[in-house]
Amino acid sequence: MQYQKVLQMLNCIPYLSVGLDVGADFTWMSIMLPNGTLTGKPFKIIHSDPQSRELAVTKIKEAQEMYSLKSRCFLESTGIYHIPLLCFLHDKGFDCSVINPIITKNSTN
């Protein structure tokens, strides 16, 4: 019973949602507050540019500090394209989940 209570409490903890729309060469990243408001404009991450990836990490960390919230990163499952970015963000200490776009689309119908 205690385990279920802890899980329910964790689901109530607000967090920043980092949405990552993954493509073959680049990814669009948006950071959203718990109330659904975007923290800024979408940011383009160029997969082949290490500085671009590091800047994305900086933007996430700045948002975490500004709003005093942890973040959760949600990447679209795109064959193999999401894997390097998923590993990169996980190695940087971010909580990441891969979302299947077909399942997500079907759940809205």
Question: Which residues make up each language-model segment?
Answer:
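Phosphate- and other anionic-substrate recognition elements at nucleic-acid/protein interfaces
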Residues: 1-109
